[in-house]
Amino acid sequence: MINAKGRYLFSSESVTEGHPDKVADQISDGILDAILAQDPDAHVACETLVTTGLAFIAGEITTKAYADFPSIVRETVKEIGYNSSTMGFDWETCAVISSVDKQSVDIAQGVSRTKPEDQGAGDQGMMFGFACDETETLMPAPIYWAHKLSRRLTEVRKSGVLDFLRPDGKTQVAVEYVDGKPVRIDNVVVASQHAENISHADLCDAVKKEVIFHTLPESLVDKNTKIYINTTGRFVIGGPMGDCGLTGRKIIQDTYGGMGNHGGGAFSGKDPSKVDRSGAYMARYVAKNMVASGACKRCEVQIAYCIGVAEPLSVLVTSMGSSDIPDEALTKAVREVFDLRPYYISKRLDLKRPIYKPTSCYGHFGREQAGFTWEVTDAAADLRTALKI
C-alpha cells in the first residue's frame, strides 16, 4: 500500500491509557511484570476483562512467584485516573475476580528443553516487523503522530492543564502521501472523555490549542487540515462503563497503525516464550536495523514458527521496492546476522525482565527509551558487512 504512486491518504489511530481495552492491557502486563520480577522463567498468559465496576482476570500461569491481583488492578486503575464511582470505575471500590490455571503440560513439554537453546516456540504462527524512514524512530508517520496526540491528551489531563478531561480517549491522523512520501496531515480526529460541566465549544478550542497544535509540527499542518473533535457533541460516559475492555483488542495501534502486515497475535499478558510477542519484537528489531543500515528505506520481516520447534519455519525480508538489493539477499543477510530461535531472541533482547507494562500503551514500537531493547540499532553495522555495502 505504501508503494502507491500519486497522491493518497493513509490513516492510523491511537488510544489513551484510559481506553477500556488499554486498561485491560495494562493490568495484564502489570501482572506479568510482577511475576517476572520474582521468576524470570515463569510462563504467563494473562487475560483481563474490565466493565462497570469489575475487573476479571483469567489465563494460564505457571510460576513460583506470588502476584497480588487485586493490588495490581487497583494500583493500575489509580495510575490511569479512574478515581470516582461517577466514572463507573473506581480504583478503591472496583471488584476483582480471578480464575487462573497452570499452563497445559502439553504446551510446556514443547517449550522446556534440557538444553535452553533448544527451547521450542510456544505456539505456531507468523509475526511481522516493519520499519521505514518516515520519522526519526523509523515508524510510519500516521501512527507516530497519532500516538503523540494520545500521549499529549493524557499529559494535559494529568498535569491539570485541561482538568476537565477524563481518562478515555482516541486519536486518528490521516497523512497525505505523494509517491510514497508523507507531505502533510490532511485530517485529525480526537475523541476525549470529559466532565459534564464543559461546553463542547470550549472543549474543542482547548483541545485544538493544547493538544493538536501543541503536538503537530507546522510543517505538516496547513489551512486545509481538517480537525474533528468529539463529533457526537458529548463524551461523558466512557472507560469500562462505556465499553467492555479486553486484553489484546488493539493490536493494530500496538504495532504500525495498519502500515504493513500483522500476524494476528496480541502482546500484553504474555511472557517471552510466546512468540506472538517475542517474535514480533524480534521482527521489529530486524526491520529497524535493516533500515538503519541504509540497505533500504522500508523493510518488512515475516517470521513463522511451529510449536515445540526452535528454528523458524520461514523467514522473509522485503524492502517493498525501496532498495536495489534483492529481497533474497536481504533475507540471507538476516539469517547470517540474527539467531531467530526463541531462546536467543529472549537472550539478545533481554526479555525475561519486568519491562512490559510501559509497552502496553502508546505502541510497543518506536519508543526509544530504557527497556525497549528491540528499538536499538546496534546490528546495523553487522548487516552492512553481511550485505557488503
Swiss-Prot record:
Give one GO term, molecular function aspect: methionine adenosyltransferase activity
Q: What is its EC number?
A: 2.5.1.6
Which pathway features in its UniProt record?
A: Amino-acid biosynthesis; S-adenosyl-L-methionine biosynthesis; S-adenosyl-L-methionine from L-methionine: step 1/1
- Primary localization: cytoplasm
Record keyword Glycosyltransferase present: no
Residue positions annotated to bind K(+) are E47
Which reaction is recorded as catalysed by this protein? L-methionine + ATP + H2O = S-adenosyl-L-methionine + phosphate + diphosphate
Q: Provide the residue positions that the database annotates as binding L-methionine.
A: E60, Q103, D243, K274
Spell out the GO cellular component terms annotated for this protein, sorted alphabetically and separated by semicolons: cytoplasm
- HAMAP family named in the record: S_AdoMet_synth1
Q: How does it assemble?
A: Homotetramer; dimer of dimers.
NCBIfam families membership: metK
Q: Which purpose does this protein serve, as stated in its record?
A: Catalyzes the formation of S-adenosylmethionine (AdoMet) from methionine and ATP. The overall synthetic reaction is composed of two sequential steps, AdoMet formation and the subsequent tripolyphosphate hydrolysis which occurs prior to release of AdoMet from the enzyme.
- Protein name per UniProt: S-adenosylmethionine synthase
Q: Which organism is it from?
A: Solidesulfovibrio magneticus (strain ATCC 700980 / DSM 13731 / RS-1) (Desulfovibrio magneticus)
Give the gene name: metK
